[in-house]
Amino acid sequence: MSKGTLFDKVWDLHTVATLPSGQTQLFIGLHLIHEVTSPQAFAMLKERGLKVLFPERTIATVDHIVPTDNQARPFADSLAEEMMQALETNCQEHGIRFYNIGSGSQGIVHVIAPELGLTQPGMTIACGDSHTSTHGAFGAIAFGIGTSQVRDVLASQTLSLSKLKVRKIEVNGSLQPGVYAKDVILHIIRTLGVKAGVGYAYEYAGTTFEQMSMEERMTVCNMAIEGGARCGYVNPDAVTFAYLKEREFAPQTDWDTAQQWWQSIASDPDAVYDDVVVFDAADIAPTVTWGITPGQGIAVDQPLPLPEQLPASEQAIAEEAYQYMDLIPGQKLLGTKIDVCFIGSCTNGRISDLRAAAEIAQGRRVVPGLKAFVVPGSERVKQQAEAEGLDQIFQAAGFEWREPGCSMCLAMNPDKLQGRQISASSSNRNFKGRQGSATGRTLLMSPAMVAAAAVTGEVTDVRELLGQ
């Protein structure tokens, strides 16, 4: 049993009661909502005659269904417009702060909360979205929840949860040029598997994470769920505090007091973990998924695995993946032709991601016939990118420059694959049909790797383009 970890400290501080079931009734400090998983929750409140208990602790935005090209209202998709109107009405009726399109702060929920300073160390955070684990980058305990749990948080500001074990994932050393945070988390998932984290919270530690920016840490924590973990986190440190300082919702008058408290909730040096796994950063290369789960990844310069050489539990899904993806065991992904390139999402739609991709795009051109587009994670990211001229770099290279939203990460808006198209994507999931076509294929990779694919027309080792 873990002891003295950040997870234990934050859990204990937010425990309201131990329920007869053995679960913990946990107070939720910050609740994030969007247009997809909240309408039914609000409807259930209305049926029971309930109000939102602490509306000031809930923040709303619209992201999943918004078009990224033409955002004029009403939306062309009537269902999307209906969901949009429902969120607007519910927020107005319950006094919930809503960052709507055109507010200057709208965007993907897991991008805007950190950039506003809403996400802070020691918090418990919930959202009706799988990738709520993103906020763990700040030393928060953040859970993705379902619609009925969204209702529970709105009504009571609590959740009934079973306490998780804690696995420490330690990565040490400096990353090689061309290797990014996305490669780190894909490497971890391919090594441990997509089910290894079930029942665990992942603590990401070691010198590699200490050297990362907050945006890089968010990329890693974002995909904790892809490794089976309910949440993932990094202990708060000077990097965390520097990011938060002077942000809109960060403490203003009692900064020193807040910083001292944040430091106190970090895992103790002698903390006891349920499990510890150690990686060497030198072993991590640019990584690309080849199959239909995020765990089916490979270093870009390595041959695809032979199913018979995989553990018995992975052989059937490997065979299924090869058939679906139309790839051959033993071959390399290098040179695989790409139809669509997508840079964005809550995993990789932040300013540092766009800078990394722009570095590759600058002075080059998207291959004719290939569709490539960049979707900033928020209106603030878009404004910053345009202030730096990144939009001009992308457009000069032949990329489309879009409005903020979840876009092609998932098939809930007009940005979708067609037929058997294969995409190079900076998003987080490569399931069958994830990007809108029942037969479409997705290769997950870093934004820089996506940009490299766009200007070469095929899976390319980004290290070959850096510095040229």
Swiss-Prot record:
Its EC number is 4.2.1.33. GO terms for biological process: L-leucine biosynthetic process. Binds 1 [4Fe-4S] cluster per subunit. Pathway: Amino-acid biosynthesis; L-leucine biosynthesis; L-leucine from 3-methyl-2-oxobutanoate: step 2/4. One of its GO terms (molecular function) is 3-isopropylmalate dehydratase activity. InterPro entries: 3-IsopropMal_deHydase_lsu, Acnase/IPM_dHydase_lsu_aba_1/3, Acoase/IPM_deHydtase_lsu_aba, Aconitase_4Fe-4S_BS, Aconitase_4Fe-4S_dom, IPM_dehydratase_rel_enz, IPMI_cat. Its cofactor is [4Fe-4S] cluster. [4Fe-4S] cluster binds at C346, C406, C409. Keywords: 4Fe-4S, Amino-acid biosynthesis, Branched-chain amino acid biosynthesis, Iron, Iron-sulfur, Leucine biosynthesis, Lyase, Metal-binding. It catalyses: (2R,3S)-3-isopropylmalate = (2S)-2-isopropylmalate. It comes from the Bacteria. Heterodimer of LeuC and LeuD. Catalyzes the isomerization between 2-isopropylmalate and 3-isopropylmalate, via the formation of 2-isopropylmaleate. Belongs to the aconitase/IPM isomerase family. LeuC type 1 subfamily. This is 3-isopropylmalate dehydratase large subunit.
